[in-house]
């Protein structure tokens, strides 16, 4: 260990020191404040002179056992500066029941842990350019969560994680194909599912009429049968429209039938709607079933929902459905646990019925659950509201109270809705080059200072700035390389070209 000295004026937040030995950007050092207490700082800039090195240090805080507390007094001028021992840093970053995700960029021997409770309950985001290491980071997190019997639902739009495997995750991965029962959707969600745009008002009106009518008249219809009955009813209405007669449709608010006179113009609308449904059935028949996809999720597993092969409207509908019913069923479960002890007999009866249904069909919501959304910008776009953004937003705002966590993964940060992004209290930010992306992330991150923003463009693959509730202090971390199997790696193009000789 060598001697380094504070030079020039000091403050409570910054100081400068000189060293005759080489020093590195990002190193952790300790100096005394004027109260004689040890203060931890990180070197944010290094200038080399002919005879010495000059380091500019940002103060992190006063060392108080294994904690960091705010520094209230300036650094002692002309005092000694020393490198922080690995042991001190290890004690700071060690978190009971934490997730072991990597090491400090400047210290291979200092492991970095994320507080599991704070990461899940207060939500997180993994942000990066394409190829920056976000899929590797998500895989490492899933490995660590699996070690703790975590219940995770991973939304996988491109099938990157369906091959996910690690020996520590043996028996803890379940791949789920997106199958939905249309009876469980609201009419507007059903319209979205079959590809009716928000601006196609007339079509959406007839979808709602037909949906309520079939649900009332055919209460046992499910899956593809339910859709076909809607299609048949619309066909009957198209014949009525061609002659200008009235149709009868069920109104659930009045619990009775209403009538509507059709014009010949309605014939064109209805036939177009029938064509849309027919095309949907042709493309997505395998994604329609008579079970609730929430029933497929298992406690203590990484449940991977493989959305590859779906178009964006169908993806959004699936994700909105999952987010909505996870949150609502979890709320129902927790409320019923209390209501079952109510002095009111009817409240007790309803609560016990809810608990029986949940224990039989939706056991996943009996434990806290983490919903990780890959390609999150698809589902929470900055200038658009959809069913997915509505319910993911509710989880971001209210999920902490009910044990439903949210993780967002995206390579397009500025396309994420700022209200939802700002609710993620821990940010794992890998390489970000575009200044607009950097500023956008900074606006959504209270702890991301200007000094850390400047570091984002210079990060290597797998290196991340981590800030927020789940980490002891803002840090630059080298994320572990996931030593199992996952599908997010770049294709070795030249290797495959050169392998043509093997064919």
From Swiss-Prot:
EC number: 5.6.2.3, 5.6.2.4
Binding of ATP, residues: 122, 131-136, 478-479
GO molecular function: ATP binding; ATP hydrolysis activity; helicase activity
Enzyme class: isomerase
InterPro entries listed in its UniProt record: HerA-like (IPR008571), HerA_barrel_dom (IPR018538), HerA_central (IPR002789), P-loop_NTPase (IPR027417)
Domain of life: Archaea
UniProt KW keywords: ATP-binding, DNA damage, DNA repair, DNA-binding, Helicase, Hydrolase, Isomerase, Nucleotide-binding
Function, in words: Involved in DNA double-strand break (DSB) repair. Probably acts with NurA to stimulate resection of the 5' strand and produce the long 3' single-strand that is required for RadA loading. Has DNA-dependent ATPase activity and DNA helicase activity.
PANTHER family per the UniProt record, alphabetical: HELICASE MJ1565-RELATED
Family per similarity comment: Belongs to the HerA family.
Name by which UniProt lists this protein: Probable DNA double-strand break repair helicase HerA
Gene that this polypeptide is encoded by: herA
């Amino acid at each position: 260990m060598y001697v380094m000295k504070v030079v020039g004026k000091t403050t409570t937040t910054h100081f400068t020191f000189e060293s005759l030995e080489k020093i590195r950007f990002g190193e952790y050092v300790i100096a005394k404040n004027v109260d004689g207490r040890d203060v931890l700082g990180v070197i944010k800039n290094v200038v080399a002179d002919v005879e010495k090195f000059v380091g500019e240090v940002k103060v992190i805080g006063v060392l108080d056992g294994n904690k960091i507390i705010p520094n209230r007094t300036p650094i002692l001028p002309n005092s000694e500066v020393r490198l922080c021992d690995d042991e001190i840093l290890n004690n700071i970053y060690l978190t009971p029941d934490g997730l072991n995700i990597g090491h400090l960029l400047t210290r291979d021997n200092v492991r970095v842990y994320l507080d599991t409770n704070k990461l899940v309950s207060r939500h997180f985001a993994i942000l990066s350019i394409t190829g920056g290491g976000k899929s590797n980071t998500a895989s490492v997190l899933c490995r660590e969560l699996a070690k703790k019997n975590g219940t995770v639902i991973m939304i996988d739009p491109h099938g990157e994680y369906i091959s996910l495997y690690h020996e520590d995750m043996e028996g803890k991965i379940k791949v789920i194909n997106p199958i939905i029962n249309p009876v469980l959707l609201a009419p507007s969600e059903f319209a979205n599912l079959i590809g009716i745009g928000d601006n196609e008002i007339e079509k959406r009106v007839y979808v709602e009429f037909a949906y309520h009518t079939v649900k009332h008249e055919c209460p046992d219809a499910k899956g593809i049968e339910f859709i076909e009955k809607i299609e048949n009813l619309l066909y009957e209405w198209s014949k009525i429209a061609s002659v200008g007669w009235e149709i009868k449709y069920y109104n659930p608010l009045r619990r009775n039938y209403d009538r509507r006179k059709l014009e010949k113009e309605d014939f064109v609308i209805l036939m177009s709607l029938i064509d849309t449904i027919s095309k949907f059935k042709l493309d997505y028949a395998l994604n329609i079933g008579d079970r609730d996809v929430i029933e497929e999720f298992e406690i203590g597993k990484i449940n991977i929902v493989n959305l590859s092969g779906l178009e964006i409207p169908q993806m959004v509908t699936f994700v909105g459905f999952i987010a909505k019913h996870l949150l609502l069923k979890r709320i129902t479960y927790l409320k019923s646990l209390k209501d079952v002890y109510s002095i009111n007999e009817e409240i007790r009866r309803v609560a016990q019925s809810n608990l029986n249904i949940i224990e039989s069909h939706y056991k996943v919501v009996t434990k806290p659950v983490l919903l990780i959304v890959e390609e999150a910008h698809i589902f929470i776009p900055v200038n658009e509201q959809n069913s997915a953004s509505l319910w993911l937003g509710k989880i971001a705002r209210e999920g902490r109270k009910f044990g439903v966590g949210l993780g967002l993964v995206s390579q397009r940060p500025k396309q994420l809705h700022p209200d939802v992004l700002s609710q993620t209290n821990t940010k794992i930010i890998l390489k970000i080059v575009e200044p607009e992306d950097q500023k956008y992330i900074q606006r959504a991150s209270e702890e991301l200072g200007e000094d850390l923003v400047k570091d984002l463009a210079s990060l290597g693959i797998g290196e991340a700035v981590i800030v927020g509730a789940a980490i002891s202090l803002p840090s630059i971390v080298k994320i572990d390389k996931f030593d199992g199997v996952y599908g997010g790696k770049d294709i070795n193009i030249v290797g495959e070209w050169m392998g043509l000789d093997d064919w």
